[in-house]
Design a protein with these regions (language model features):
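Bacterial N-terminal signal peptides that target proteins for export
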Residues: 37-48
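Active-site neighborhoods and metal-handling regions in enzymes and metal-associated proteins
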Residues: 41-42, 60-525
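Short hydrophobic targeting helices and cationic amphipathic motifs
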Residues: 7-8, 13, 33
């Protein structure tokens, strides 16, 4: 009987089991060759070896599948691709790039669009959706044995059968066949065939499209660093190599699809929110005067990785005192001072989805009278906003009704300073408390503000906030809202927000209590 090389690791185990299974045991004659091992057993041992071989092969396949996502069934990816087929028609194709492979020893993270359509997390892959015959093909590079030996399993075109089983695509082809296959679609001979591909920049890791576009704009403004985006280069290549195709933007369709989350997506976002909440609670417990902002970051990251996150969904915003006044303060280099508030806005990248939760609390563990009045206003505003969220309404309608409630809330209320009263009155006029979608990116694609009708499956943040420029004081909390069939659910409601709950959590022991670390102030730029 001939046994291929992948059984080598269990030869010894098999012989031991055979020895126990038979009274008379003869040491097998093993002849080593460069690529295979020939083992001759007596006939009565054959069936036992065959059974064990099948078990081992099953284990190997299970290990290979470990490198593929387990959050979504094949049917969900197929349904997403079917929606694209329905929209582009039979005289068009859609072509989607994966993220490129990463240099050095960085961990690869797939682009959100590519992952959304097939779940595959390998670089330099292409997904072709042929509207003419409604078939789907994945194009992948060939196996790099040296890289696999160093890094572990990497799915390649040689794993075609496994990839078809995992993703539900019709075919898996070598990447060098893509050009000929575009011709082979037969559409080029037709009348004005269309090729759809995303024009918008691909999000990976802790990126959001709006921030990527800001980065592109800054680079374009630099006469020494003007860059062409990867998407623009891809579109240019398509136009040069296949001028017969009219190239159109697939991003608007993908954005509308991603705006409405499935039940499975909401499950993953819920888990990401739970991890974010636990991380913020750990940061609360680790807070005391003299602790550095970066130590709260470390406490939160510990919770992220402890619960299986692959990193952060966006850079942590942790600002003590006046640092919080900067809405996206990322440096985290200052010490936390007695009497100040500290704001944390942070969530993980969990299975390619994230969350967006913010809390603010007193460094010394107790809100003073001035802080209490302003903070309770923010709590009341959050409650008023959630009160009116339901299917069929709009953000503008929610904002109008909540603002009316807050005008009533202020009747009879007093604040310590005129600047504080002015801030809360301006807060009622501010239209940004109803914020942005959240999903695969923290500032996810699609729109929920203005006159967009809310639908079940939309996930976004409710983020009431006020600024007091005279004191460089900024106060806000942020929660995760998901529209249900009957109303709304606050996914982050469990994260302490009531004053008594926040103060109680701060008093609990945290990481910096039982695992003290020397605070090394970072050098400021």
């Amino acid at each position: 009987m001939q046994v291929t090389a992948h059984f080598l690791s269990v030869i010894y185990l098999l012989t031991l089991m055979l020895k126990r299974a038979t009274k008379s045991y003869t040491k097998p004659n093993i002849i080593f060759q460069p690529t295979k091992i020939h083992i001759m057993f007596s006939k009565k041992h054959f069936h036992l070896l065959l059974f064990l071989s099948i078990v081992l092969n099953t284990i190997v396949q299970a290990q290979e599948k470990h490198y593929y996502q387990a959050d979504f069934p094949i049917e969900e990816f197929e349904a997403r691709r079917t929606k694209i087929f329905n929209e582009i028609g039979n005289n068009a194709i859609a072509l989607i790039q994966s993220a490129p492979s990463v240099a050095g020893f960085k961990v690869f993270r797939q682009s959100n669009t590519f992952y959304y359509l097939c779940g595959l997390e390998e670089g330099h892959a292409y997904l072709l959706l042929n509207g003419k015959n409604r078939s789907t093909t994945l194009y992948l590079p060939h196996r790099e044995e040296g890289r696999e030996k160093s890094q572990g399993k990497i799915l390649s075109v040689e794993d075609a059968d496994l990839i078809i089983e995992l993703t539900g695509v019709n075919r898996v082809r070598p990447i060098e066949f893509l050009g000929n296959d575009l011709v082979g679609t037969g559409l080029i001979k037709g009348s004005t065939p269309t090729l759809y591909t995303p024009f918008s920049p691909a999000e990976t890791g802790n990126d959001s499209r709006d921030e990527i576009l800001h980065g592109h704009a800054r680079a374009a403004a630099d006469p020494w660093d003007s860059q062409t985006t990867r998407e623009a280069r891809f579109i240019k290549l398509i136009n040069e190599r296949f001028p017969e195709f009219e190239v159109k933007d697939l991003s608007p369709l993908l954005d509308s699809m991603r705006l409405i989350k499935s039940e499975k997506e909401i499950e993953v976002i819920r888990k990401a929110t739970e991890i974010a909440g636990l991380a913020i609670m750990e940061a609360m417990r680790s807070t005391k005067p003299g602790v550095y902002e970066y130590q709260l970051d470390a406490a939160a990251k510990y919770v992220f990785y402890q619960h299986g996150s692959q990193g952060d969904g966006y850079p942590a915003i942790i600002g003590g005192g006046t640092n919080a006044f900067m809405g996206h303060y990322f440096r985290k280099t200052d010490v936390l001072n007695n009497g100040d508030l500290v704001l944390m806005d942070y969530a993980p990248d969990y299975h390619n989805y994230t969350s967006d939760v913010t809390r603010i609390w007193p460094v010394n563990g107790t809100f003073n009278k001035e802080q209490t009045a302003l903070y309770e206003y923010i709590l009341a505003y959050s409650k008023a906003l959630f009160k009116y969220i339901k299917p069929g309404t709009t953000a503008n309608e929610v904002m109008d009704k909540a603002a009316a409630d807050m005008k009533q809330y202020l009747v009879g209320k007093t604040f310590a300073k005129p600047a504080h009263l002015k801030a809360v009155e301006n807060g009622i006029k501010f239209r940004g408390h109803f914020q942005h979608p959240v999903g695969m990116a923290v500032h996810d694609v699609g729109r929920v503000r203005g006159n967009v009708k809310l639908e079940p499956g939309m996930v976004f943040t409710i983020d009431p906030m006020i600024w007091i420029p005279e004191e460089r004081l900024y106060i806000r909390i942020e929660d995760m809202a998901v529209v249900t069939e009957t109303g709304v659910e606050n996914l982050s409601a469990f994260v302490p927000s009531q004053i008594s709950d926040v103060e109680k959590t701060i008093k609990e022991k945290g990481l910096t209590e039982f695992r003290p670390a020397k605070s090394l102030p970072l050098k400021k730029n």
